[in-house]
Curated annotation (Swiss-Prot):
Species for this entry: Desulfovibrio desulfuricans (strain ATCC 27774 / DSM 6949 / MB)
Gene giving rise to this polypeptide: argH
UniProt protein name: Argininosuccinate lyase
GO molecular function: argininosuccinate lyase activity
Cellular component terms per the entry's GO annotation: cytosol
Class of the enzyme per the UniProt entry, highest EC level: lyase
Length: 466
């Protein structure tokens, strides 16, 4: 059977059906249709300006591609698996519409640089959405923090009670994480927005192309420095997937805390019904399924990153068909990251914090022990000695099943005579939070400064996704 592939001139027969199915990518890379058309229109305009084709032909190609775009948007476009991918499907339909003029679109271009530009455009568009969603989640966390500036809860290390902190401070820790995530994606975009068009298959082209004008036309910052590098690397995908993996890691950590806090043993939050599910057998259950699934889906995004690293690790220069596998993993990661950020923003907006339970929990675990040690330092003890005396006080309180603040003054003075009546004000949990005003600390002025910093940054994030 004679092949009708674009590359079929030197072949006597086409690929077997099983081979065609195995190599087909149009079933998923059609997601790139808008970016492919955008890149092809920029290429056509450049060909017209450079005299490679006439300006009239360039305009016809642009108009024909507009028509193809509308057909795809309206679901009237007929996808043909035998044409392998989105790029050849679009070009074939353009040729059906425009005749021989359509066949001129690919002049001076290889699928290698064509695919590279289309995918870079797609990744850039998606990263911008991730960036805006991360910023939107950051904004919600900042807002919830301002609502709880005066509420305290146990801060933990090793998941053990450590020191009291404000709920605002705890929430802002995640706000800073998602701010960094958004900034990291912005840095990544600087390297994604590099156009490979003009590199052709690997060695450049003899046509008098103007790659810089194509880059400018599609909104990119510049062009490749080496044509072989331009078509043979996918480090921009790796970097994007790392950014997505880091977002998911931060989301997963927040999910873990939500899951713990929703457990009645903690009882720190009430989950919205709309972000919970029940049990088919236990009527009382209210399960944090959204948080659990988000924690689980983190592994999917990690898998996409590891898969892409593995695909690229042994490829010689320049382009190899292995690189077709770059898209499915990214497409899956894109759906997961975008949906997770959107759902977490909604959940954090509606979640109810049980601040009474948080405050009560501060009384367990001797969270004010560091306050006593610092108090003793103020009384003239070296810190290591103060640390030892405080440990003795903790042991004495623990033996009586009460808090440090419940020890009598004589009980404490028996361990260290310099302890005075003023120690009880020091041992107050809320006061302990208020005293920590170092930069980035949990004190109210420090928290207010953090809020101001984050809001200043958010104000520069134009067009945040809601």
């Amino acid at each position: 059977m004679k092949t009708n592939q674009s590359w079929g001139g030197r072949f006597a027969e086409g690929p077997k059906e099983a081979v065609a199915q195995y190599t087909d990518s149009q079933s998923y890379d059609r997601a790139l249709y808008a970016q492919d058309i955008r890149a092809s229109q920029a290429h056509a305009r450049m060909l017209g300006r450079q005299g490679v084709i006439t300006p009239e032909e360039a305009q016809l190609l642009v108009e024909g591609l507009d028509r193809v775009r509308e057909e795809i948007r309206s679901d009237s476009f007929i996808w043909k698996p035998e044409l392998e991918d989105v790029h050849m499907n679009i070009e074939a339909r353009l040729t059906e519409i425009m005749g021989n003029v359509g066949k001129k679109l690919h002049t001076g271009r290889s699928r290698n640089d064509q695919v590279g530009l289309s995918f870079r455009l797609f990744v850039a568009d998606r990263l911008e959405t991730w960036r805006q969603r991360a910023a939107a989640l950051c904004a919600i966390l900042v807002q919830r923090a301002t609502e709880h500036a005066g509420d305290i809860l146990p801060g933990c290390t090793h998941l053990q009670p450590a020191q009291p902190v404000s709920l605002a401070h705890h929430l802002l820790a995640y706000a800073w994480m998602f701010r960094r995530d958004a900034m990291r994606l912005g840095d990544c975009l600087d390297r994604v927005r590099i156009s490979p068009l003009g590199a052709a298959a690997l060695a450049g082209t003899t046509y008098p192309l103007d790659p810089q004008s194509v880059a400018k036309d599609v909104g990119f910052d510049g062009i490749y420095g080496n044509s072989m590098d331009a078509v043979s690397d996918r480090d921009f995908v790796l970097e994007a997937l790392f950014g997505g993996s880091t977002i998911m890691m931060h989301l997963s950590r927040l999910c873990e805390e939500i899951i713990l806090w929703a457990n009645p043993a903690f009882g720190f939050v009430r989950l919205p019904d709309s972000y919970s599910t029940g049990s088919s057998i236990m009527p009382q259950k209210k399960n944090p399924d959204v948080a659990e699934l988000m924690r689980g889906k983190t592994g999917r995004v990690y898998g996409s990153l590891m898969g892409m690293l593995t695909i690229m690790k042994g490829l010689p220069l320049a382009y190899n068909r292995d690189m077709q596998e770059d898209k499915e993993g990214f497409l899956d990661a894109d759906r997961t990251v975008e949906a997770s950020l959107r759902l977490m923003a909604g959940m954090m907006e509606e979640i109810a914090f049980r601040t009474d339970r948080m405050r009560e929990a501060c009384k367990a675990g001797f969270l004010n022990a560091t306050e006593l040690a610092d108090y003793l330092v103020g009384k003239g003890l070296p810190f290591r000695e103060a640390h030892h005396v405080t440990g003795q006080c903790v042991a004495a309180a623990e033996k009586q099943a009460k808090g440090l603040e419940d020890l009598t003054l004589p009980e404490m003075q028996a361990l260290e005579p310099r302890i005075g009546e003023d120690v009880y004000a020091i041992l107050d949990y809320a006061a302990a939070v208020q005293r920590r005003e170092t930069p980035g600390g949990t004190g109210p002025q420090s928290v207010a400064a953090q809020v101001a910093q984050l809001r200043t940054w958010l104000a520069g994030m134009d067009g945040m996704v809601q």
